[in-house]
Amino acid sequence: MACSTLSKSPKDKIDPRDLLIPLILFLSLKGARSAAPGSSPHQVYNITWEVTNGDRETVWAISGNHPLWTWWPVLTPDLCMLALSGPPHWGLEYQAPYSSPPGPPCCSGSSGNVAGCARDCNEPLTSLTPRCNTAWNRLKLDQVTHKSSEGFYVCPGSHRPREAKSCGGPDSFYCASWGCETTGRVYWKPSSSWDYITVDNNLTSNQAVQVCKDNKWCNPLAIRFTNAGKQVTSWTTGHYWGLRLYVSGQDPGLTFGIRLSYQNLGPRIPIGPNPVLADQLSFPLPNPLPKPAKSPPASSSTPTLISPSPTPTQPPPAGTGDRLLNLVQGAYQALNLTNPDKTQECWLCLVSGPPYYEGVAVLGTYSNHTSAPANCSVASQHKLTLSEVTGRGLCIGTVPKTHQALCNTTLKAGKGSYYLVAPTGTMWACNTGLTPCLSATVLNRTTDYCVLVELWPRVTYHPPSYVYSQFEKSHRHKREPVSLTLALLLGGLTMGGIAAGVGTGTTALVATQQFQQLHAAVQDDLKEVEKSITNLEKSLTSLSEVVLQNRRGLDLLFLKEGGLCAALKEECCFYADHTGLVRDSMAKLRERLSQRQKLFESSQGWFEGWFNRSPWFTTLISTIMGPLIILLLILLFGPCILNRLVQFVKDRISVVQALVLTQQYHQLKPLEYEPQ
């Protein structure tokens, strides 16, 4: 150990103090597992486990493509690698990380005597202090680590409980007192239920001897992660331990650390002055018309050289505006293919506010992959959430009761390390976000759940009457305006079939009789709008031509004869303003809307017209209508009811008076006269 005054009796190796209770409390305070900020837990990264020396320099590493916190390989650095640039008693204080094994080889290696060798490794080994600077010393170190009466032990440093204050710091290799060791290869076999790793030899003694004779690193360790270590997500900052040899005298030691680093697969670096606006492409200029080829003179006998045809260039990628327009065009094509009757007259509008997409749960057959597919490594800057998911489809994982209504079939992920890839045209909508593939390891380790969904843009379907009504002065609707989304009309198209329940909304697609006249004029209005846009395009084209002419004219400043037009030999050298045509077309459109407004008002009854005269008239009528009706009923039926009530009261009073009078008189008995 660190202090030479400590006794070396085997009985002192066992610490009677029990630290289990504070250690368990410490473990219970560890934070919950989390993936990279703003990413899906199923996303695949290039993960690297690094083993560092005492100066926190990487001396050994292993990499692989896996989701975070699912890959726990066995780390096999050599013991002497941990001593690179380490304490002087290891003999490698001047060796940089990743250096080859230093020192002369043994004279009795596997290839026989070697030039410049030092000592024969077959000679009896002495009890010299084991070092790593020669093959002989590394062979001695191998004997120490495999001997039953010697060995090595490991003490935790950065993550140990606060109660273990007597274990010291890096200067004592975190093993200042007995009882601090949690793992290692010594006869008392230290262990711990809370430490993150276990450390053992990775080679047998016979295997290590032969490797040492060949002048190689021959003391590899086997570092394995414990269950407690697999629950920790602070590996990116690193954890550190101390390792000491159990030999006679003072125990030599060193410190090492383990940390994790990860990065996205394939760098995606924007190029340009503004990475945010790199994809905001401008509208492409119209391709110039090819100039007609001039035929050579008939009398010319010189052979003409045929220039090779230019290689066709690929069209530039679509900008943001083009992508939005493609969404609407794709929605129309899909709707026209499946329901052509609904595309005769309609308006498809791309929703400008969130949510921009919605999902339809579907049933499908996913595929299993033992290695991570390419689409599993696609990085996402944010976790995408579907705020609206409808239908019933395939679910996987631990689905809560609040979301079981979305599940037609619920499956459990089997054990093993593999990936579940969604079918083409679908994605997994998980409680952690959207992802094209799932990691079975993540599903088995967590309580996540996912639903197989189709992703549809929020494109709303409107009948023509709804759009024209927005231009009318009256915004009063007898019923809520129709607003069917593309997901309701085409849900389940990818997996075969239309979403259930669409038939219940077909009656809403039928316009009222008052708007039938508006439907017939849709095509005419669209033609007028098209003409306006065409005229505007001509104006912009004419303006651009003038700008180009002016630029070319600047190159001909020294040509002073005839002016700019004569020098350029242009037939047209003025700006043709067609904005007046645009104003005329828009005026015609407004006139037609006004005519339809009058036609709509003429088709209404006199009573319906009251409610369109002013916005407060409807509120006034609905407020006083109730009291007026009650007052009218009182005036009509009040006198009759009052007379009947008075007559009833009089009858009751007369009966009471008769009863009172009868009780004031007594009936006289008749007298009997006797005959005389």
Curated annotation (Swiss-Prot):
Residues 513-547 form a coiled coil. The record marks 479-480, 659-660 as: Cleavage. It comes from Friend murine leukemia virus (isolate FB29). Residues 642-676 are cytoplasmic. The keyword Methyltransferase does not apply. Residues 309-318 have a biased composition (Pro residues). Specific enzymatic cleavages in vivo yield mature proteins. Envelope glycoproteins are synthesized as an inactive precursor that is N-glycosylated and processed likely by host cell furin or by a furin-like protease in the Golgi to yield the mature SU and TM proteins. The cleavage site between SU and TM requires the minimal sequence [KR]-X-[KR]-R. The R-peptide is released from the C-terminus of the cytoplasmic tail of the TM protein upon particle formation as a result of proteolytic cleavage by the viral protease. Cleavage of this peptide is required for TM to become fusogenic. Residues 548-564 are annotated as: Immunosuppression. A motif (YXXL motif) lies at residues 665-668. Residues 35-270 are annotated as: Receptor-binding domain (RBD). GO terms for biological process: fusion of virus membrane with host plasma membrane; symbiont entry into host cell; virion attachment to host cell. It comes from the Viruses. The chain crosses the membrane at residues 621-641. The lineage of its organism: Viruses, Riboviria, Pararnavirae, Artverviricota, Revtraviricetes. Keywords: Cleavage on pair of basic residues, Coiled coil, Disulfide bond, Fusion of virus membrane with host cell membrane, Fusion of virus membrane with host membrane, Glycoprotein, Host cell membrane, Host membrane, Host-virus interaction, Lipoprotein, Membrane, Metal-binding, Palmitate, Signal, Transmembrane, Transmembrane helix, Viral attachment to host cell, Viral envelope protein, Viral penetration into host cytoplasm, Virion, Virus entry into host cell, Zinc. This is Envelope glycoprotein. The gene is env.
